[in-house]
Amino acid sequence: MIRRKCGRLYGIGIGPGDPKLLTLKAKEIIDQADIIFCPKGDEYGTSWARSIIETTTSAPKEFVDLRFPMTRNKKVLKAYWKKAARRIAEEVTKGKQGAFITLGDPFIYSTYIYLLRTLRQNFPDIEVETIPGISAFNAAAARAQIPLVQGDERMAILPVRKDLRGLREAFETFDTVILMKVGSKLDKVMALLAELDLLKHSVLVSRIGQPGEKIIHDLSSLEKIEKEGYLSVIIVKISEKENLT
């Protein structure tokens, strides 16, 4: 890693949760970084991303937790993005090489996207390099052994909104639909899938690569077990003629 008068920030995707899914380049940069910035949602909790990285590096590291609260209030979020950007700039402008770690891929529904935009607006002289990571839905497909698309099939990736906006249209338009940010909306999603006779064409993978990982090939069975919406991805294969069981 080349040293500069002003350091550089690396935005690093660390994958879905399994430390072994960290890419070689990501691990190399993390091992060489002077300081690692870790996002967390709860003021008093720990950073999940940090707990993953702490198991992969033996070199002494300076860790800095950056809080990004779980809220949709843009005014509140912008204040935290600016605070995080200032904290990063404070260290990187000293010549330190920094790594901001994020689950999955940095450019897929990641806090890093907003942080990068804030850095560009307020600290344009700081060099930033983004390192891709394995996304949750890629890992979910691999764990469940489900091809995402083949031939001329089309795929959509959607976050689940409270009103399920756009889901019905996606199921009618695409061959494969990936549902992310399922969370507490799982019951509503299941009801829609049942209405469209898609429960047996859907697979849910939760806590991918983590202790307690679950792979459920028939969502109708979710009624008999604990609901698993948190940290989950649902893959719906509309084009499959056979059930995914």
What annotation goes with each model-predicted range?
Residues 108-172, 224-225, 238-242:
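Class I SAM-dependent methyltransferase SAM-binding "motif I" and its flanking Rossmann-like core
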Residues 1-19, 24-26, 31-127, 190, ...:
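Class I S-adenosyl-L-methionine
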Residues 76-85, 143-146, 170-173, 215-222:
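Short, surface-exposed amphipathic charged segments that create phosphate/polyanion-binding patches used
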Residues 16-17, 41-44, 68, 153-162, ...:
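Short, acidic/turn-prone active-site loops that include or flank metal/cofactor-
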Residues 43-46, 71, 135-138, 186, ...:
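Short gly/pro/ser/thr-enriched loop/turn and capping motifs at secondary-structure boundaries
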Residues 2-5, 28-29, 92, 100, ...:
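Solvent-exposed alpha-helices and their adjacent loops that cap or buttress functional pockets
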Residues 9, 171-245:
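A contiguous loop/helix-start segment that scaffolds small-molecule binding in enzyme catalytic cores
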